[in-house]
Amino acid sequence: GNGSNSGHVRVYEWDNSSWTQIGNDIDGEAAEDQSGISVSLSSDGSIVAIGAGDNDGNGDNSGHVRVYEWDNTSWTQLGGDIDGEAAGDYSGYSVSLSSDGTIVAIGAPVNDNYSGHVRVYQWDNTSWTQIGDDIDGEAANDFSGISVSMSSDGSIVAIGAGDNDGNGDNSGHVRVYEWDNTSWTQLGGDIDGEAAGDYSGQSVSISSDGSIVAIGAKYNSGNGISSGNVRVYEWDDSSWNQLGSDIDGEAAGDLSGHSVSLRSDGSIVAIGAYGNDGNGNLSGHVRVYEWNNTSWTQIGDDIDGEAADDQSGHSVSLSSDGSFVAIGAL
C-alpha cells in the first residue's frame, strides 16, 4: 500500500450479517517496514496499536509502533511514532494495549545484543510517555520481548524470552512484572521452559487481572518432536503455580503453542498449531480448551485450516468472554 512490504492493517466490524471494513487501510510508513507484524486493539475496538519492526525511523530496522484512534470517520494517529531505541532493535515486533488503549507495551527482542527489552508507554492526551525504565532481558541472546501481554489496566505485563537458557539452552522463559507507581517489579520467579530447545515464551497471554498466564513452547516434544505445548500458570500472591497438566500438541511437528490467547478471566485458552496436518500438510489448526477446576478439556472439535500449506493458527485471538476466536492463516 505504501511501497513493497510496507504492510498495512485493516479493521473490520461485524454488522450481524457480514464483516465490514471500518475506514481505510492503515498503511505502513515506507517500503520494507512490515507494518502489522504485531497488532493490538482496545477492548471497545476504537484504538489500535500497530508494530512495524523493520521501520527505520531511528536507524535501520529500529522499528516503531503507531497508535490510531477511530473518530467515526477515519483512523487518526494518536501522538507521534514510538520509535525503537537504536538501529536493529526491531521494536514493535510485539505489542499489547491496555483495555482502554491508553497504555501500550512494546517488545524489541533484538535490543542490546539480542537480550531484548520491553518499554511501556502511557498516553497523556498529548504524547506517549515512557512509564518507568526499560524492562531488559536477563542475558544476551535471550530475545526478551519476542512476545508481550498486558493486563486490562496496564499495571501488569508478561514478557516472553524464548531463547533464554534458564533451564537449558533455549529452554525459554516468561517473566511477569507489576508497576508499583515507581518501577517495574518482577512478580515471583522466572517461569522457565520445561527443557532445552523448547523456546518457551515465544507466545504469551495474560488474563485481564494479571493473575493467570498462558505460555506457548512450540518446540516442546511432550507428544513427539516439536509437537509443542502450552502451560498455564496462576499467581497465588507469592509464586506462579501451573494449572493442570501441559496442553500438548496433537502430533510431532505440530508446533502447538506458536500462538495462544486467553479469555479475560483465564478459564478458556485458544492454541494455534500451524504445523498440524489435519486437513492436509501444514494446514494447521486451533484448539480451544476450558479449565474445569481440575483439568483442561477441549471445547468442540479442532478448527482446521482450509487447505494444505495454509498454516492456520499462526495467530489467534479470543474474545473477552471466549465465545469468539479469530484465526490467522499465512
Task: Indicate where each model-derived feature is located.
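Conserved beta-strand/short-helix segments
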Residues: G1-L330
